[in-house]
């Protein structure tokens, strides 16, 4: 089972709220699908993550990795039980928010 950090939960809630406000149920479903894919990838191949999102190598940190699922960049912890640390839409200002 993959855990979610409070920051990641807040980011997911904000994305869902935005999609609801904009009447974009397909986008909300795509977010859920991306999270499911990320959880599966982290559980099966935790070492396959990238050190940082490709456009932002400066975000590399020890003990965390990134993966792209759908249109989302997802950060997760690499030590201990799997924890999703952050979830960003691909065009978000990731360095400014992480």
Predicted segments with their positions:
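Basic, Lys/Arg-enriched alpha-helical interface segments
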Residues: 1-63, 97
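Enriched for short, Lys/Arg-rich terminal
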Residues: 67-98
């Amino acid at each position: 089972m993959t855990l979610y950090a409070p920051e990641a939960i807040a980011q997911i809630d904000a994305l869902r709220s935005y999609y609801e406000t904009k009447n974009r149920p397909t986008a909300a479903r795509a977010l859920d699908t991306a999270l499911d894919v990320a959880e599966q990838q982290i559980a099966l191949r935790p070492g396959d993550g990238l050190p940082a999102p490709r456009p932002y190598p400066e975000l590399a940190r020890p003990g965390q990795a990134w993966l792209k699922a759908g249109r989302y960049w997802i950060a997760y912890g690499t030590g201990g039980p799997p924890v999703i640390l952050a979830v960003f839409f691909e065009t978000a200002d990731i360095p400014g928010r992480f």
